[in-house]
Amino acid sequence: MDQLGSGHRNVFRDEEPGLTGIGTEPEFAIGQRALLVQTAQGNILWDSISYLDDATIEAVRRLGGISAITISHPHFYSSMVEWARAFDAPVRLHAANRAFVQRPDAAIEYWEGDTLALNSEVTLIRCGGHFPGSTVLHWAAGAGGRGVLLTGDTIYVVSDRRYASFMFSYPNLIPLPGSAIRGIVSAIEPFAFDRLYGGWFERVIRQDAKQAVTRSAQRYIRAIQERPQNT
């Protein structure tokens, strides 16, 4: 952590009322950023970044601290134990990802099933796909009450911000089967959301996000099932 701090700092960006992005500059690891969801029933830290210093701790405390931490999938577990200890907050992970936890700690609490309500505004949804316990977060009060979905890279926002994509392995470009894509879409279907935040700054679908995910899934399934045309 000290070595990382010698050339890096964390930055905070207001994404919308009640939602703050936290990322590291220059980019570290794969450049992901965390999101702090601020609710009257306590703040939820979604996903984790590796670097944590005193300035970051103080800035988060000014925003109301952290009542719980939850992480989309194992690639973002990184320094979750340090974050948990700094804020005396539990880390809630899906039990299907237990085997991927490299640093067991008393702060880690595993949940099972398809959904977990963290409070009246925030619900975790197990989608699977990228990992067996890959999870997204639904924030009902987000986007002015139209609903927000935080997805990490379970649902990956592509460059045009009008579509999303899905992968079993991003570094190796291994796709998911159609059945897994249908499972992801089915898992989020009961939840209303107009905006979607992926795992990186700027990877955001600002409006009509639910429709964007549906048409993205349809496009993806067509692409992996249809025989490509000769060119």
List the predicted regions and their residue ranges.
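Flexible, charged surface loops at secondary-structure boundaries
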Residues: R13-E16, V37-A40, R61-G64, A143, ...
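Active-site-proximal loop/helix segment associated with metal-binding centers of metalloenzymes
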Residues: E25-Q32, A95-A96, V101-A106, E112-D114, ...
